[in-house]
Regions:
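Structured, charged N-terminal subsegments at the starts of enzyme catalytic cores
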Residues: 122-128, 132-141, 217, 221-224, ...
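Conserved structured core elements
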Residues: 15-18, 173, 200, 204, ...
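Acidic, glycine-enriched catalytic cores built around paired aspartates
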Residues: 2-82, 100-120, 185, 234, ...
Length: 730
């Protein structure tokens, strides 16, 4: 039987339930709530009609009060307007909770883009073996970041979670109490979170959502796709930026990095302990229960007394496999699925739970490296190796960076950023020792604009008594010019024998990050996206020529202006000329709670990502490939839109408008993130230093989507005027 269209399902469940539960607000014991709920629709109607007539906001508000509430004092007017905001905020939370509750009804959990659909499609086209082969080599890497786009405090997110459960259970009394709780709960934070606070809030999603949803997917693949064959791939990697992302955040220290890594390990061990405790109630068989309880005890001791009781990952894996073997050999495989579920999760999450990435700006690295070379102890240690470094050309500087190594202590330096940069590398080694190599094995260089930017990090790793660093060095290309130069930079990197030797030790794979947010801020929507697409094609071709595998790590935000949108459709649309053995992307702030906040939404969206990568390889769609005419059209559109965007940015009042008319000055004053709204300490506003999030967010708050679409209309209109629009539509 055919399902109703999605919009009909949405109206039937979400909209109708919202109307029912929204009426509960009127029953809450708040003095002004009836007045607010009665006045709000009238006010909305005045706003709608006034906006249609082109009236400014002040005139609309004054007209409303003069006509409807003429006796109100200025204080009472302000109070009512503030009550409107409070009321609408809580209506939005209710709507979010109802959406979460109705997710499985509105979205087809077994439809297109899900693993079940993909498996059936592969089966019917005789591609099941091909699918298995591909799944053994394909990965999705979700990197959680604490970018400040989540305005809800943790207490409100908790209420949303409880509300969605209550609505699913049709518990009217509980829902009413939760709405009253919502009415008494602050929607703002008293103080800025620390980087560790941000890490803790995101670890909640790892513990309560991803641990189960990703585990379920791996379970499904083993049971239904691979069956008697073996899945030798964990499928998912989870990355983690809070506590490790130093780019523009002076509050991320080496101590915070280590503390965050310890918290990640503690959290995953706690999940293993809970799973073992649950297993002990089922696996009550002779010879099995003793093993489960012994393992449970060892995990408990490692959790709460790690210094005295160390636990090796290999031991945990071996014991679980022994328990599985006993179930099969002596107990007819009873509850085998439960022990396999835990085995898969241990393989997936190890002792690291999520891999911490370190990230820093290349300009900071450059300053740090200059400080290193001026240091007396370093000069004494390295001698002629670094002589005249600053006066040499880039080729010779890179030659030195490739050769130098040693044991430079952070204690050599009084400069804070230099000492902390080197100390962070020592912390990397410590995390790998405690949590396994995956605990922290990637170093991202933001604003990467040269070969030297990459080799400076390579040199610092080897100067930290780490001759063969177990670290993936990842250049992040963000601006339009850096994206255009990325291929020549990476080509020089691939022609460096010492670096290639390092790359071979890392599986002959180079990860390259591409920044959608800063790219769009720099060049506008069309130019940024087209430049990234072309960079991926060129870098894929280059990597193939050098027999190197390349993985693209996409720095994507929530809105289109920061690379957001329908992520799975984006990956579906990539042509066959782009290497895609991995999908790697950042998931930021509010996108985490909205797309991965519940078990159902998390599993659904993870499956969509997984199937989007598979689809391009197993069911090849040549319609995604662009021909010469398509490329010419895109080049022209991107160039025209870029010029319009650049001309707008060059307007003498552009920055003044941002500072004085939009919400930009308030971003730095909100308590939604630990990171400052701009890089550096300059008081004067500079687009180069301004973060993409406040830039995009400020335009968005003003209802002017400049970063998302400015210049696109100009380019499209040019084709329309010249009767060439069919070239755009083809």
């Amino acid at each position: 039987m055919a399902r109703e269209p999605k919009i009909d399902r949405f109206n039937e469940v979400i909209r109708s339930k919202f109307q029912i539960y929204n009426s509960l607000f009127l029953t809450l014991p708040f003095a002004s709530i009836k007045r607010t709920s009665l006045m709000l629709p009238l006010f909305a109607d005045y706003c709608k009609k006034g906006y249609a007539k082109g009236q400014n906001p002040m005139r609309i508000v004054n007209k409303f009060f003069n006509k409807i509430l003429p006796d109100y004092s200025e204080n009472k007017k302000n109070e009512l307007l503030f009550n409107f905001i409070q009321y609408v905020e809580r209506q939005v939370v209710l709507f979010d909770a109802i959406e979460d509750a109705g997710f499985s009804y509105v979205n087809n959990l077994h439809g297109r883009g899900t693993l079940r659909f993909m498996k059936e499609e592969a089966d019917s086209s005789d591609n099941l073996d091909k699918l298995r082969e591909y799944l053994n080599n394909f990965k999705v890497r979700i990197v959680l970041t604490a970018h400040p786009t989540q305005f809800y405090p943790g207490s409100v997110l908790g209420i949303i979670n409880d509300l969605s459960k209550s609505i699913n259970n049709d518990s009217l009394d509980t829902t009413k109490k939760l709405l009253e709780q919502l009415g008494r709960t602050r929607f703002y934070k008293n103080k800025k979170p620390t980087p560790y606070d941000e890490a803790t809030s995101l670890i909640w999603y790892l513990e309560n959502v991803f641990f189960h949803s990703a585990g379920s997917i791996v379970n499904y693949l083993n049971k239904n796709v691979f069956e008697t064959k073996k899945l030798d791939n964990s499928i998912f990697d989870f990355g983690f930026w809070p506590g490790g992302d130093r780019d523009g955040n002076p509050y991320v220290t080496p101590d915070i990095t280590l503390k965050t890594a310890n918290k990640l390990k503690h959290s995953v061990l706690r999940n293993y302990y809970r799973a073992l405790r649950s297993l002990s109630r089922k696996l009550t068989f002779e010879g099995v229960l003793e093993k489960v309880e012994n393992l449970q005890d060892k995990v408990y001791k490692a959790l709460f007394n790690a210094e005295k009781h160390t636990l090796k990952l290999s031991y945990l894996e071996d014991e679980l496999n022994q328990i599985h073997k006993l179930l099969k050999q002596k107990n007819d495989g009873l509850y085998e699925d439960l022990i396999l579920d835990l085995i898969y999760k241990v393989k997936l999450f190890g002792f690291h739970f999520a891999s911490m990435d370190l990230r820093q700006d290349s300009r900071v690295h450059s300053d740090v490296f200059n400080n290193i070379l001026k240091n007396k102890e370093v000069i004494s240690l390295l001698g002629n190796q670094i002589k005249n470094y600053s006066t040499l050309d880039e080729k010779n500087r890179c030659e030195i960076l490739t050769k130098i190594k040693g044991n430079i202590s952070p204690s050599f330096f009084t400069n804070k950023i230099t000492a902390e940069t080197l100390e962070s590398i020592q912390v990397m080694k410590e995390i790998q020792k405690n949590n396994g190599e995956k605990g922290c094995n990637r170093y991202i260089i933001s604003n990467c604009n040269s070969l030297e930017s990459i080799l400076q990090v390579f040199a610092m790793l080897r100067l930290s008594n780490w001759n063969k660093p177990k670290v993936d060095i990842i250049p992040l290309f963000e601006t339009i010019s850096d994206l255009k130069n990325s291929t020549s930079i990476v080509k020089s990197l691939f022609e460096n024998p010492t670096y290639i030797s390092h790359l071979e030790s890392r599986g002959n794979k180079q990860t390259i990050m591409l920044g959608f947010s800063d790219g769009t801020k720099d060049g506008g929507y069309l130019m940024a996206n087209w430049s990234i697409y072309k960079a991926k094609e060129d870098l894929s071709k280059l990597a193939s020529e050098y027999n190197i595998s390349v993985a693209f790590f996409d720095g994507r935000g929530g809105p289109p202006a920061r690379g957001g949108g329908r992520t799975h459709e984006f990956y579906n649309s990539l042509g066959n000329d782009i290497q895609a053995d991995d999908i790697q992307l950042t998931i930021q702030g509010q996108t985490i709670s909205s797309n991965f906040g519940t078990l159902e939404s998390s599993q659904y969206n993870l499956e969509q990502l997984l199937s989007s990568g598979i689809k391009n390889e197993i069911f090849i769609n040549n319609s995604n490939n662009l021909d010469t005419q398509d490329r010419d059209t895109m080049d022209n559109l991107a160039s025209m839109s870029h010029k319009a965007y650049e001309d707008f940015k060059a307007h003498p009042k552009f920055l003044k408008y941002l500072e004085n008319i939009t919400t930009l000055p308030y971003y730095a004053k909100t308590n939604i993130g630990s990171r400052p709204s701009k890089r550096g300490i300059n008081k004067e506003l500079s687009l180069d230093d301004l973060r993409a999030i406040p830039f995009v967010g400020s335009w968005s708050q003003s209802k002017q989507n400049v970063p998302g679409f400015y210049g696109v209309g100009t380019a499209l209109n040019e084709y329309k005027k010249n009767n060439k629009f069919r070239e755009v539509k083809r």
